[in-house]
Amino acid sequence: MIKNFIKQHDEYMGEFVYGAIDGSVTTFAVVASASGANLATKVVLILGVANLIADGFSMGVGSYLSSKSRAELRNKRRADIVEIGSPVVRALVTYAAFIAVGIVPLIAYISEYILNINIEHKFLSSIALTSVAFIFIGLMKSSVTNTGKLKA
C-alpha cells in the first residue's frame, strides 16, 4: 500500500530525500551541540523543535520557489520535456520530510521529557536513531528508483 502510494508520486522523491536528509542532519547537529554543552533535555527539545520549524519552513519555501522558477524557465524555453510537478506539492513534500525525519534525532529527548522515560544515553540513542533514519531514506529511494538497496 505504501509502496504503491510512493510509486504514484515518485516525481517528488527528490524533495523527500533532500528534506529528510537535511532535516535529520541539521537536527542531529543541534542535538550534538546541545548534548556536548550538557544542556538540559528541555533546552535540547526547544532548540531541536525551533530548528525543525524554521529550517523546515525555509526548505519548503525554497523548494517552492525553485520549482516555480524551473516552471517559468520551462515555459520560456518550451523545450524542456521533463515534468517537474506542482511547486506547492514539492514544497509540502520537502517540508513534511524535513519534519518527519528531522524529528528522529530528538526522539530520545522527547521520550524523556514528555513520556518520563529515563534514557541514560540519549545522545547515543540519537546517533542510532539517526542512522536508522538514513537507512529508511535509502530504502524509500531504492523502492522508487529500482536501484539496489546498498547503492541507494
Protein language model regions, located:
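Hydrophobic, small-residue-rich transmembrane alpha-helices and their short perimembrane loops
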Residues: 1-109, 116, 120-133, 141-143
